[in-house]
C-alpha cells in the first residue's frame, strides 16, 4: 500500500516503513507528524476521490533534522569586474512513515 502526499510544495510517494527527506518541519526528533493533504492512496483499489481522501492521513515520525548539499551561486557581470559568490544549504527533515490511515 502506498500514498502520494504533498508537503513543502512537493509531492512524495510513500509507503509504510519508508524514510523520506522533506523540507524542514518544526518538531523534535521522535515527535509524530500527520501529513495532509493526501493526493492518492493505492490499496485494494486506487483512490483519488477528494471526499474519500479527506479522512486519510499519513502518520510519520521525525527521525532527524539535516541539511541538503551545498549549492554554489555566482553572479558575474562582464567588463566591470563585478563578482559575487554565495552558497546555500536547504534545511531538511527525515521522516519515517509509520502508517497510512
Curated annotation (Swiss-Prot):
GO terms for biological process: translation. Coiled coil: none annotated. It holds the Pfam family Ribosomal_L21p. One of its GO terms (cellular component) is ribosome. It comes from the Bacteria. PROSITE patterns: RIBOSOMAL_L21 (PS01169). Keywords: Ribonucleoprotein, Ribosomal protein, RNA-binding, rRNA-binding. GO terms for molecular function: rRNA binding; structural constituent of ribosome. This protein binds to 23S rRNA in the presence of protein L20. HAMAP family: Ribosomal_bL21. Part of the 50S ribosomal subunit. Contacts protein L20. Belongs to the bacterial ribosomal protein bL21 family. PANTHER family: 50S RIBOSOMAL PROTEIN L21, LARGE RIBOSOMAL SUBUNIT PROTEIN BL21M. This is Large ribosomal subunit protein bL21.
